From Swiss-Prot:
Gene Ontology CC terms: extracellular region
Upper lineage: Eukaryota, Metazoa, Ecdysozoa, Arthropoda, Hexapoda
Organism of origin: Rhodnius prolixus (Triatomid bug)
Cystine bridges: none
Modified residues (Phenylalanine amide): 11
Protein name: Short neuropeptide F
Length: 11
């Protein structure tokens, strides 16, 4: 899942 809050980018 690219929309993971762990990444917090712009997805």
């Amino acid at each position: 899942n690219n929309r993971s809050p762990q990444l917090r980018l712009r997805f």
